[in-house]
Amino acid sequence: MLEMAAEVGDGVILNLFPRSFFPTMLEHIRIGAERGGKKLEDIEIVCRHQVVVTADLAEARNRMRTQFAPYYATPVYNNFLAWSGHADKAKVIKEGWAERDRNKTTGAMDDQLVDELACIGSVGECQDRIREYADMGITTHIISCPSPDALQTTYEAFTAENFSF
C-alpha cells in the first residue's frame, strides 16, 4: 500500500507503526515514488503521532495498551504488526482477542512496543522524538494525544511558541 500510494499519489499518511520499522517503510515509499517517476522528496509523508506529555509513564503506557491493542487485533493492523518485526506479539494479541481475554490482548503490548509506537515522556523528550521523526523523513506531523488528562499539556508543548524544528 505504501508503494502504491507513493506511485499514484502525492503523499502517504502513516499511523501506529513501530519507530524502528520506519526505515523499511520509507524504502517502500521510495520504491513507489520512483515507479511513478518521482523522487522520494516529492512525496509528502504525514504521520499521526500518539504523544503523551506526562511524568506518569505507566499510566500513559497502559492507556496506549487499552486503546490500541484492539486495533492490532484486526487483521490489517495485526498483519502489519507482524510484518514490522513483532510477529510474536501480533500472534498473542490475535489469540487474546479471539479468546475474549482483554488482559492477554493488552499484555502483549509490552513497554518496549508501546515506546516504539508512541512518544511518551517529558515535554523535551516528546519534542525531541518528533524532531527525530522529522530528521528521519516525516514531513508533516499530526500530534494526537490519547490521554484526556494530558491533552492540555501535550498540545501546549507543540504550539508555535513552544516548538519548532
Where are the regions a protein language model picked out?
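Active-site-adjacent structural elements that line small-molecule/cofactor binding pockets in enzymes
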Residues: 1-165
